[in-house]
């Protein structure tokens, strides 16, 4: 933050506190906006160029030119988009998220997509921050922008907390609690989908090479449940269980070594998934059964133990025994 000479703060959620669904206030006096949070962190000599660019809902693009100029005059641009939510009885006309506010299309609302693309075309590095309570279709953003952060509705200290992450005071460690689809047409999309008689998704398509699952796309999520990145890196090894066979009342104790191989102290969410290898019933391709969040210093290694009661894996079948394979989801 101290080395930046200029930064563009852009977007409909840049100077607005989003407290979340069922919250009574939308007044910025009750919280810290992202714009204010960033101003609190940067050097006093850093130039802040703010431009709203567009609203969350309107198709009016007249403010985009100002945002483009702000980006051109800055070393980096941070765009705050997403959605808005509040108490059902207050300011409901500007809500795009929450109970009773469903979107028929999960593309970013209003002129947000155009704003992002025109700022991107300036050549200034762009960070997209989604302040939202729902997933959006952001495949273009994923393929073109160097960084995307999802903040959700962070409440009163939202501006200070996102500034801490943007400037490296805090290393991000969140994991998605639902999946982001590639398009609205890809819904429903789950991490724990049921396989068809063709098994796993093996033949995704593209315009250059049409496939079968989707002719011109992959049926998998753009970002799946459990996904999340960090400023540091982790390596897993020596996954093992305490026994090879278990009785009905037993609990599986699985251990794995996790090492922080990066330069920063960071938190990792160790996730244990299971998959039924053979069954007379159709079961999900994988299911999350346990997780633990740990903090490791650079170079530090820790053995993590995860537990799964056999009762959580029950499939009632008197004649055919079943076996499971342990999987882990580590996508940093």
Language model feature labels by segment:
Residues 1-328:
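C-terminal non-catalytic regions of proteins with extracellular/luminal or membrane-system context
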